[in-house]
């Protein structure tokens, strides 16, 4: 999860209210643009809930975002190594991650969904049924800690059974090709792909996952982002933004 394995090193400048010539106001952002609706590519542009939310902060501060795309592990590694000032792409706040990086206050709640193809008709009424199926998800996701710390001790599922991929794109491709039974997806990601792919929720984990912006340890930027989220961004405006991207 902390290994630095950058997949793409192409930097894009996203203007948010000031000139890119002012280097002091440039914020280096690490993303994984394969996590809709939080962060993804559309018509050659990087878009998403997380980006629009952080652009609101940037507009208030008069700064510029310099965005670099990575695979999931590379994104987190860029924050840990301080190659990036912040990372966002629907990143779950976990105790394990907080040992290596700092997080903003949570900006939204999330679910974790086990998704299958409609024609497989996989419905898990009891997690004891899980071990008969293959599960896949991107490397570096918080699901690994959940399986290791919660499911494995109970004999429900073993981490060495999991298939790991670079991003959700490869996970869903293998699911559709019949090489995978269940894809572990963030609830926000699942809500998008249910509209375009023949998939359904087979099981949903609720009540313990929250998204936040990730920062290097000791980041002063984190403090200012928290001040913006707490004192300047109205709760109703934040919820309207979330509803817009989840609709």
State where each predicted segment sits.
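Sec-dependent signal peptide recognition
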Residues: 2-9
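Extended ligand-binding regions for polar small-molecule ligands
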Residues: 48-61, 119-142, 212-247
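Ligand-binding clefts/hinges and TM-proximal coupling segments of bilobed small-molecule sensing domains
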Residues: 20, 64-67, 142-163, 197-203, ...
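Short helices/loops that flank or line small-molecule/ion binding pockets
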Residues: 60, 68-69, 73-86, 100-102, ...
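Extracytoplasmic small-molecule ligand-binding "clamshell" domains
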Residues: 22-91, 164, 244
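A ligand-binding cleft/hinge motif common to bilobed small-molecule-binding domains
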Residues: 77, 89-100, 148-149, 173-207
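C-terminal motif of bacterial Sec signal peptides marking the signal peptidase cleavage site
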Residues: 14-17
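Periplasmic-binding protein-like
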Residues: 32-34, 109-116, 187-230, 247
